[in-house]
């Protein structure tokens, strides 16, 4: 990302804290359920739809920082200005970022992800981000999992009452005092699958998680 002007730095700083405060205020009013889960000892690839980004830091806070014993994970985030705001917000939850995407900086992001995994860090990907189409799966998650022989896990949340933004990703923001179900799926292994078959398997895994979590 290019060097930021003073005006942009101020904008990002204000947006960063407003979003951080907003999601915490919503989260604290909600009834939240985290489905009991576990991850393998070795690193893995975790995927969730871009439209579930708003409240996903709380899944990291609960599982990676608490239940998994301060296990490390980093999220692949685009170099776009929206990605800069996201990077700043999630940093307050102790979440690191690997900058780049399938549209810009993709090769750099992939190499960064491989390096992090070899250092024992899980890599989290929004397969339809940063620009869509909605619920599409880019090549990165499949390539990463197959190259390093890693399992893939679907991370998801659904809310009993929510706002759905008119954005390409149909961002879901739970309403205050709603119920939120978080889940982390069983492992998916893509060994032997073609690129297209692997991408479709990830899609179906995420859809299955959404269907299950929507039962309140």
Feature-to-residue mapping (PLM):
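A short, well-structured juxtamembrane/interface segment
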Residues: 21-43, 61-62
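Generic structural signal for residues positioned in beta-strands
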Residues: 31, 45, 74, 181-183
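Glycine-rich, highly charged phosphate/nucleotide-binding loops
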Residues: 31-33, 105-109
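Conserved beta-strand termini and adjacent loop/short-helix elements that scaffold enzyme active sites
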Residues: 35-37, 78, 100-103, 185-187
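Residues that cap or initiate secondary-structure elements
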Residues: 38, 52, 81, 131, ...
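Catalytic core of membrane glycerolipid acyltransferases/transacylases, capturing the structured
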Residues: 42-103, 148
């Amino acid at each position: 990302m290019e060097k930021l002007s003073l005006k942009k730095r101020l904008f990002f700083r204000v947006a960063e804290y407003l979003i951080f405060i907003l999601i915490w205020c919503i989260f604290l009013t909600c009834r939240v359920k985290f489905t009991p889960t576990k991850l393998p000892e070795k690193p893995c690839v975790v995927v969730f739809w871009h439209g579930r980004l708003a409240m996903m830091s709380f899944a990291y806070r609960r599982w990676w920082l608490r239940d998994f014993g301060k296990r490390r994970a980093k999220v692949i985030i685009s170099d776009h200005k929206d990605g800069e705001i996201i990077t700043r917000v999630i940093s307050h939850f102790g979440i690191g970022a690997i900058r780049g995407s399938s549209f810009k900086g993709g090769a750099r992001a992939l190499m960064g992800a491989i390096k992090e995994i070899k250092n024992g860090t899980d890599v989290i990907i929004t397969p339809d981000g940063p620009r869509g189409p909605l619920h599409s799966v880019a090549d990165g998650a499949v390539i990463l999992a197959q190259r390093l022989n890693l399992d893939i896990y679907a991370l998801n949340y659904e809310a009993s009452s929510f706002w759905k933004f008119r954005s390409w990703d149909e961002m879901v923001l739970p309403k205050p005092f709603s119920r939120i179900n978080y889940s982390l799926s069983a492992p998916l292994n893509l060994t032997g699958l073609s690129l297209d078959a692997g991408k479709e398997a990830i899609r179906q895994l995420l859809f299955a998680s959404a269907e299950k979590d929507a039962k309140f």
